[in-house]
A protein has these predicted regions:
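Substrate-binding/access-modulating region of protease and related hydrolase catalytic domains
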Residues: 113-185, 227-230, 234-235, 267-272
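Active-site/binding-pocket entry motifs
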Residues: 53, 68, 113, 196, ...
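Glycine-rich, phosphate-binding/catalytic loops in enzymes
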Residues: 61-66, 156-158, 186-187, 206
Length: 274
C-alpha cells in the first residue's frame, strides 16, 4: 500500500508524539499479570463483519454463525443462525488474528457486510443488539457508519453493552472522519500504530484511544489463504485478542476495568503511587 493509503490516525502513535499517561499501579510486568498464560478459554467473541471462513487453518472452528437479513415486506432486520462463507475475506482476517492469540476462545461470526465490504447501518444495529442480548464477552467491530441518524441508537446500544458486561472493540475510520460507534467512550477505539511488533500504545487525545500493529500485517484471508494488509481494522482485531486473553484470565473484570488494564500495559504508561 502507498503512504497515502496508510491510516491517517496512525500519526497519534508516532513514538516521538506519545505522552506518558498515568496508569493503574498493577504488578510488573503488566502484560504478564494481565494476560500471561491465558488462552482465551471460556470467553465468547463475536466478529461482526463479512463472515468468517470456517476451518481456515488460522481460524479453526467457527463455533457459531448468524446472518442479518431483511424481513420480507418491510425495513426491519432479523438475525438468523446459519452457516455462511466469508464474502470478502475481511472477517476471516479479524477472526484469524483473534484465534491465533486466543486459540481456546469461543468464536462466532455475525455477517453484516457483503462482497463489496459494504452493508447497511440498520444491519449493524440489529447485529449489535443481538450480540448484546446474547451477552458476548467481546465484540469486534472493524466497521462503522457515519450516518448521523444512527448516532443515538448506536450510542444506546454501546451503553447497554458497557453496563451489561460486553467489551466492544472498534476500529476508527482509516481517514479523518467521525464514524460510529468508535467515537463513543463506552467502547475501546483502536488505530494502527505501525508494523508487526509495534507496542500497544495509549493516546490521551481522542478519538483513537489505543494503537496496535496494523501496517503490513499478514492475516488469514478467504479460500484458505493469507494476505498482507494495512488498516485500523486489523489493529482492532489485535486488541480484541488481548481483551479476550484478559477476560479469560480475569473473568470478573468489567469493561471499564479492562480498558484500564490495557492502558496500564501500554508502552507509554507511567506508574503512579497508589
Amino acid at each position: 500500500m502507498t503512504e497515502q493509503d496508510r491510516p491517517a490516525w496512525s500519526e497519534f502513535f508516532v513514538p516521538s508524539r506519545l505522552r506518558p499517561v498515568a496508569a493503574l499501579p498493577l504488578p510488573q510486568p503488566v502484560a504478564e499479570w494481565a494476560w500471561g498464560g491465558s488462552d482465551g478459554a471460556g470467553v465468547r467473541v463475536a466478529v461482526v463483519d463479512s463472515g468468517v471462513e470456517d476451518g481456515h487453518r488460522l481460524v479453526g472452528r467457527v463455533d457459531g454463525a448468524v446472518v442479518v437479513e431483511d424481513v420480507e415486506g418491510g425495513d426491519d432486520k432479523r438475525v438468523v443462525e446459519r452457516a455462511h462463507p466469508d464474502l470478502y475475506g475481511h472477517g476471516t482476517a479479524i477472526a484469524g488474528t483473534i484465534r491465533t492469540m486466543a486459540p481456546a476462545c469461543e468464536l462466532w461470526s455475525v455477517q453484516v457486510l457483503g462482497p463489496s465490504l459494504k452493508g447497511r447501518a440498520a444491519s449493524l444495529v440489529a447485529a449489535l443488539r443481538w450480540a448484546v442480548q446474547q451477552r458476548f464477552d467481546v465484540v469486534n467491530l472493524s466497521l462503522s457508519t457515519g450516518g448521523s441518524a444512527w448516532f443515538a441508537p448506536l450510542q444506546d446500544l454501546m451503553d447497554d453493552a458497557f453496563f451489561g458486561g460486553t467489551v466492544a472493540v472498534c476500529a476508527v475510520n482509516n481517514v479523518f472522519s467521525a464514524t460510529f460507534p468508535a467515537q463513543f467512550a463506552s467502547v475501546i477505539s483502536v488505530a494502527s500504530s505501525g508494523p508487526p511488533g509495534s507496542p500497544l500504545a495509549y493516546n490521551v487525545d481522542p478519538p483513537a484511544e489505543f494503537g496496535a500493529p496494523g501496517e503490513d500485517v499478514t492475516v488469514a484471508w478467504r479460500d484458505g489463504g493469507t494476505a498482507t494488509v494495512t488498516g485500523n481494522s486489523f489493529s482492532a482485531g489485535y486488541v480484541s485478542g488481548l481483551v479476550t486473553l484478559i477476560r479469560a484470565k480475569h473473568p470478573g473484570l468489567p469493561p471499564f476495568a479492562v480498558k484500564s488494564v490495557l492502558a496500564a500495559a501500554a508502552v507509554n504508561a507511567a506508574r503512579v503511587s497508589p
